[in-house]
């Protein structure tokens, strides 16, 4: 028994909603993966605000139709595809995909779309090498704290410098 038109429309609506919330889409060839392996991939992605969706290419085509951010995904819609839609931690999710692929040696990345642009395999790897959002925020906070500390030291140094100069001047005057 095939899917009804209402069921297909519901799936397309769900995919559109997921795409609206996503920053990046990674297309994987999932041929040869077991249900257990797909579940493992999904659980890894869940911790990084990613979702793995397996759907027909024709339904994905309908979901991206008219959405300029995702139209380039069309070129990847051949064969057996799993669509990884990533909301926030793009680097963490791509790392999760790559570690999964390294362990299973069954799945292959067909391509990815980020900010309306198709990414090459090397660009996808570069994204995975980026530090997580938390690490970047900690580095920025540390840098800002360092600047604030230097400013405070500089501000305190001005009166101290004036005081030292006056003291030296008064000592010279006394001698």
Curated annotation (Swiss-Prot):
Part of the ribosomal stalk of the 50S ribosomal subunit. The N-terminus interacts with L11 and the large rRNA to form the base of the stalk. The C-terminus forms an elongated spine to which L12 dimers bind in a sequential fashion forming a multimeric L10(L12)X complex. Forms part of the ribosomal stalk, playing a central role in the interaction of the ribosome with GTP-bound translation factors. Belongs to the universal ribosomal protein uL10 family. It comes from Prochlorococcus marinus subsp. pastoris (strain CCMP1986 / NIES-2087 / MED4). HAMAP family: Ribosomal_uL10. One of its GO terms (biological process) is translation. This is Large ribosomal subunit protein uL10. GO terms for molecular function: large ribosomal subunit rRNA binding. InterPro entries: Ribosomal_uL10, Ribosomal_uL10-like_sf, Ribosomal_uL10_bac, Ribosomal_uL10_bac_type. GO terms for cellular component: ribonucleoprotein complex; ribosome. The lineage of its organism: Bacteria, Bacillati, Cyanobacteriota, Cyanophyceae, Synechococcales. CDD domains: Ribosomal_L10 (cd05797). Signal peptide: none annotated. Keywords: Ribonucleoprotein, Ribosomal protein, RNA-binding, rRNA-binding. It holds the Pfam family Ribosomal_L10.
